[in-house]
Amino acid sequence: MGKIIGIDLGTTNSCVAIMDGGKARVIENSEGDRTTPSIVAYTKDGEVLVGASAKRQAVTNPKNTFYAVKRLIGRKFTDGEVQKDISHVPYGILAHDNGDAWVQTSDSKRMAPQEISARVLEKMKKTAEDFLGEKVTEAVITVPAYFNDSQRQATKDAGRIAGLDVKRIINEPTAAALAYGLDKNGGDRKIAVYDLGGGTFDVSIIEIAEVDGEKQFEVLATNGDTFLGGEDFDNRVIEYLVDEFNKDQGIDLRKDPLALQRLKDAAERAKIELSTSQQTEVNLPYVTADASGPKHLNIKLTRAKLEALVEDLVKKSIEPCRTALNDAGLRASDINEVILVGGQTRMPKVQQAVADFFGKEPRKDVNPDEAVAVGAAIQGGVLAGDVKDVLLLDVTPLSLGIETMGGVFTKIIEKNTTIPTKASQTFSTAEDNQSAVTVHVLQGEREQARFNKSLAKFDLSGIEPAPRGMPQVEVSFDIDANGILHVSAKDKKTNKEQKVEIKAGSGLSDEEIQRMVADAEANREEDKKFQELVQTRNQADGLIHATRTAITEHGSKVGGDVIGKVEAALADLETAMKGDDKAQIEARSKTLEEAGQSLYAAAAAAEQGGNADAASGNAQASKAADDVVDAEFTEVKDDKKA
């Protein structure tokens, strides 16, 4: 059995971890970072960028760069939260045929948020595979505790599109509790996990206990807001900067996607800087232009101003904490430890609000960016049998039930019920001789059915004619360990039964998922071909450089016909490199290589010829020297007198 990896699929950043030698280990991605931006971009060349590379080009390609899609996953286009998001993102959000919120590129290509999330999951999968040196097919993926059934299903679908068998979906705060509590001793204790991430907020009250030598993590209650997070804090800063610039220059930057993307980056940086300093400056030269010329944005932002801008958002996160405590039957003083998770919890104002509410300082020894992935990896280890003596008891975050006569929501499973769980209730017909009943499955807390989330509708037919109130129809709900619901309705008299796994009404059909899986596989093949083409181009480029160097060094030693062949092969290869035909580049590289070898051979021969001439000259000089006869000279005296 291969490794089951743990993935924190975040709104802003994602992270992957594995169990390694009995301990959870966060894996660095190909850029050497422990977290990866949850950003996917489509370039004009058809390349798909994921992570840091997508983030780097966002300013110049705003309409094709998708971020924070986790806030759209499993949602209807008409949802108030989705409508609110439309004005804050530069890319297109539109309604799919089934009413889902989908995204759209500048050339009108439509994609489900699940497809975008699948790209991020693929990157996490590849990161793990590169580290392990083996194929990875199984994963535990985390979701916000307050995700409903539709959002959980959609996350599973994203995993499937990415080529992953999602063994378990677990709640982010629960995963963080696992990461924190696995190696901690000190008896039973109750902890609060406050998780304020990039796009969602959750709070869970969890009891960690030793039961018969087994460490048990039991979620007592959970609450949250799936549309509250760091993105909202960023948007407050963006709104402030836009308003200030409008006052100063009379130009509304909301209408400029390029300027908005630059503002988003600047707002996020400013927010982060103000966690450690009291003041920062947002400086964006050439942010826009009008008839009078270019305009520059330069605005000072203090920590006090930032805190004033987001004060209501911080307060909004405290109410779910109060509800979760009440649901758990506890007071703030009963909580032993408070754990902070999610990047937004680095903000001093947030930390202070949490400390004030719970009456104790939150712990700082848990990495808010990595704890969730670590917990997911631990759960993966539990499922694989690598981690022993750990029991995780999670809960369903929202009540589940059906619509009954008069539009009433009748709960069958109450919120904060430990999962997996089953529950049944018997209902009857509303009219005489009714031969079928429609079961409308809902999720939520409102008394009126229409205000809750509709999950599915199905019919149980073949009921024998009888006066109203006589037939008995048993409706059973079964929630699995992933928090995903299965519903059945049975006529007790005839034993006719209708079962349905809730495929969220806002989810993808099997056909759509299969198409997306095929598309993802095709893209993986395309990406592989692209990498091979780049490698071939790089090798060809190196060959061209080496050949030009050889011409410079040896060109004067060889004949013009040899140089002519090399120059022609060079030109052919350079032409081929302007295209995308890998085979042609390889063929012309081979031709140039052969021409280059001819050049080296000719140069070597020329050098040998030169050496031979030199050797011949030396030989003749030697022979002349050999003809000289050694003799002794004596002075001859001439006695003749002139």
Swiss-Prot record:
GO terms under cellular component: cytosol
Biased composition (Low complexity): 603-623
The organism's place on the tree of life at top rank: Bacteria
Xref: CDD domains: ASKHA_NBD_HSP70_DnaK-like
Region ranges (Disordered): 603-627
Keywords on record: ATP-binding, Chaperone, Nucleotide-binding, Phosphoprotein, Stress response
Residues modified as Phosphothreonine: T200
Family annotation (SUPFAM superfamilies): Actin-like ATPase domain, Heat shock protein 70kD (HSP70), peptide-binding domain
Keyword RNA-binding: no
Induction of its expression: By stress conditions e.g. heat shock.
InterPro entries, per database record: ATPase_NBD, Chaperone_DnaK, Heat_shock_70_CS, HSP70_C_sf, HSP70_peptide-bd_sf, Hsp_70_fam
Known function: Acts as a chaperone.
Name this polypeptide is given: Chaperone protein DnaK
Organism: Xanthomonas campestris pv. campestris (strain ATCC 33913 / DSM 3586 / NCPPB 528 / LMG 568 / P 25)
Gene symbol of the encoding locus: dnaK
